[in-house]
């Protein structure tokens, strides 16, 4: 019974360690800044004048040249 208890304890420690590593917050993919959420997808992004240059943009687009 001693060997089985030792194995169960080892498995328990491995599970606890794995959960700790997985749940540890990682900031590798972001620059650490909180970006403001947008309702529009990236393809409908507007330029500094508020113009959407994608032909399928849902709102009125600016006319003229870029």
UniProtKB/Swiss-Prot annotation:
GO CC term, one of those recorded: extracellular region
One Pfam family it belongs to: Toxin_8
Protein localization: Secreted
Keywords from the UniProt entry: Amidation, Disulfide bond, Ion channel impairing toxin, Neurotoxin, Secreted, Signal, Toxin
Propeptide, residue positions: 24-46
Domain of life: Eukaryota
Disulfide pairings: 51-57, 52-62
Record's compositionally biased regions (Acidic residues): 32-42
Transferase is among the record's keywords: no
Region (Disordered): 25-48
InterPro entries according to UniProt: Conotoxin_a-typ (IPR009958)
GO MF terms held by the record: acetylcholine receptor inhibitor activity; ion channel regulator activity; toxin activity
Tissue expression remark: Expressed by the venom duct.
Signal sequence coordinates: 1-23
Residues with the Threonine amide modification: 63
Domain observations: The cysteine framework is I (CC-C-C). Alpha4/4 pattern.
Family: Belongs to the conotoxin A superfamily.
Record protein name field: Conotoxin Bu1.4
């Amino acid at each position: 019974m001693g060997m089985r208890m030792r194995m169960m304890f080892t498995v328990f420690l491995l599970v606890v360690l794995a959960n700790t590593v997985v749940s540890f917050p990682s900031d590798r993919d972001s620059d650490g800044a909180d970006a403001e959420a947008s309702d529009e997808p990236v393809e409908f992004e507007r330029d500094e004048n508020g113009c959407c240059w994608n032909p399928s943009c849902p709102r009125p687009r600016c006319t003229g040249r870029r």
